[in-house]
Swiss-Prot record:
One of its GO terms (biological process) is L-cystine transport. Its main location: membrane. Disulfide-linked heterodimer composed of the catalytic light chain subunit SLC7A9 and the heavy chain subunit. The heterodimer is the minimal functional unit. Assembles in heterotetramers (dimers of heterodimers) and higher order oligomers. Interacts with CAV1. Keywords: Amino-acid transport, Cell membrane, Disulfide bond, Membrane, Phosphoprotein, Transmembrane, Transmembrane helix, Transport. Disulfide bonds: none annotated. This is b(0,+)-type amino acid transporter 1. Belongs to the amino acid-polyamine-organocation (APC) superfamily. It is found in: Apical cell membrane. Mediates the electrogenic exchange between cationic amino acids and neutral amino acids, with a stoichiometry of 1:1. Has system b(0,+)-like activity with high affinity for extracellular cationic amino acids and L-cystine and lower affinity for intracellular neutral amino acids. Substrate exchange is driven by high concentration of intracellular neutral amino acids and the intracellular reduction of L-cystine to L-cysteine. Required for reabsorption of L-cystine and dibasic amino acids across the brush border membrane in renal proximal tubules. The lineage of its organism: Eukaryota, Metazoa, Chordata, Craniata, Vertebrata.
């Protein structure tokens, strides 16, 4: 018994299952098609089917509304091309995290992981699953809203199922993503084809004088861009799993080049389809635009719309879990989270502890009554980190010239995206100042307290608490440390 104690005390440096192979690591099982499906499947969630009215409400006219949707697609593509350079230059999973680490050091990277892992990503995951559960439960409660308890229980079950699938197998998770992406493209095709047929039949009244009454103020345009970009969010998801991409130098940029323009074309055509059967006023009054479209165009087969929207939301939730779990994994590997979160399942070769942690935090977020306001105020932080990351790309052009760049975008692209990101961060604060933005900034900065206590100084008492927890979780989950951080 006495001989085993020292081995347990050294578990942070060496696995307690020290006879495991040294090559335990994430496997490269995501190809080009799966990469495109992850991008398309994560971007196209419930937003384009339920609330495209948010862009219209700020532009007040059909013409500017369609221009905003196109502009958001172009901006997403430009941002993703910058991330393609970063992803092929620094071939590590974790999205913005390793890029901020290389460009600016550990503190900005830690603050990104702190705010992303505890608020932005799990709360978004929870909202997507709540949206899915509402669509599933509503048909069983005709004439009234489904009980909150039912919706939350279904959302918790969805989170548990998605977490389990992605913990079991990378390949299974990507197959599930491919299936749901195909399903959502079916409903996208149905809406687009129906709209084009109606357009060919002469339903063009809503496109006449399409710029009349347009709102062109800075505040209105910034809010319209915010709402449009929310529907495009997910364009950087493939960078979270770079280490699992086959031939990332080829497949990462190709998936971006094919995936995001495809989404952009779909979004514009879907909006055109909506306007063939609804006036701007009717669209603004609709609670679920795609359902209204289905009732008017697809009856008596209109039931397929909520079914496929449910498929779309669960696909977006799966893509979010698949990629965000890797951020937890990389943060744990760098010592910015509990070490056990960076461990890999011996049997499944998945970052199971990271995915399970992400699922638990997301489940906590479905308990409160309304978390939309929290996410809305943190959405500006998303573009804060996007802008900071792309600024890091510009900085590394001068400070890290020795790094190989298989893809090198023209310098004006990251400069343009950085300026737009700064505009998106500052515009809502200036045009509609609120204390919540200050609270958001204070929360992000509060991560510094935990950074210096648990990461920088590494107090002995914290290590004594974490070591036995890590050891027991490692034995319970049959996980081991990964290979050394790829350089």
């Amino acid at each position: 018994m006495g001989e085993t104690v020292p081995r347990r005390r050294r578990e942070d440096e060496k696995s307690i299952q020290s006879d495991e192979p040294k090559t335990t690591s994430l496997q490269k099982e995501v190809g080009l098609i799966s990469g495109i499906c992850i991008i398309v499947g994560t971007i196209i969630g419930s937003g384009i089917f339920i609330s495209p009215k948010s862009v219209l409400s700020n532009t007040q006219a059909v013409g500017p509304c369609l221009i905003i949707w196109a502009a958001c697609g172009v901006l997403g593509t430009l941002g993703a091309l910058c991330f393609a350079e970063l992803g092929t230059m620094i071939t590590k999973s974790g999205g913005e995290y390793p890029y901020l680490m290389e460009a600016f050091g550990p503190i900005p990277a830690y603050l990104f992981s702190w705010s992303s892992l505890l608020v932005m990503k799990p709360s978004s995951f929870a909202i997507i699953c709540l949206s899915f559960s509402e669509y599933v439960a509503t048909p069983f409660y005709s004439g009234c809203e489904p009980p909150k308890v039912v919706v939350k229980c279904l959302a918790a079950a969805a989170i548990m199922l998605i977490t389990t699938v992605n913990s079991l197998s990378v390949r299974l998770g990507s197959y599930v993503q491919n299936f749901f992406t195909a399903a959502k493209l079916v409903i996208v095709a149905i809406i687009i084809i129906s709209g084009l047929v109606l357009l060919a039949q002469g339903n063009t009244k809503n496109f006449e004088n399409s710029f009349e009454g347009a709102e062109v103020s800075v505040g209105a345009i910034s809010l319209a861009l915010y709402n449009g970009l929310w529907a495009y969010d997910g364009w950087n998801q493939l960078n979270y799993i770079t280490e699992e991409l086959r031939n990332p130098f080829r497949n990462l940029p190709l998936a971006i080049i094919f995936g995001i323009p495809l989404v952009t074309v779909c979004y514009i055509l879907i909006n055109i389809s909506y306007f063939t059967v609804m006036t701007p006023t009717e669209l603004l009054q609709s609670q679920a635009v795609a359902v209204t479209f289905g009732d008017r165009v697809l009856y008596p087969a209109s039931w397929i719309v909520p079914v496929f929207v449910a498929f779309s939301t669960i696909g977006a939730a799966n893509g979010t879990c698949f990629t965000a779990g890797r951020l937890v994994y990389v943060a744990g590997r760098e010592g910015h989270m509990l070490k056990v979160l960076s461990y890999i399942s011996v049997r499944r070769l998945t970052p199971a502890p990271a995915i399970i942690f992400y699922g638990i935090v997301a489940t906590i977020y479905i308990i409160p009554g309304d978390i939309n306001s929290l996410v809305n105020y943190f959405s500006f932080a998303t573009w804060l980190f996007y802008g900071l990351t792309i600024l890091g790309l510009i900085v590394m052009r001068f400070t890290r010239k020795e790094l190989e760049r298989p893809i090198k975008v023209p310098i004006f692209i990251p400069i343009l995206v950085t300026f737009i990101a700064a505009f998106l961060v500052l515009a809502p604060v200036i045009t509609n100042p609120a204390w919540e933005y200050l609270y958001c900034v204070l929360f992000i900065l509060s991560g510094l307290v935990f950074y210096f206590l648990f990461v920088y100084y590494k107090f002995e008492w914290a290590q004594k608490i974490s070591k036995p927890i890590t050891m027991h979780l490692q034995m319970l989950m049959e996980v081991v440390p990964p290979e050394p951080d790829p350089k």
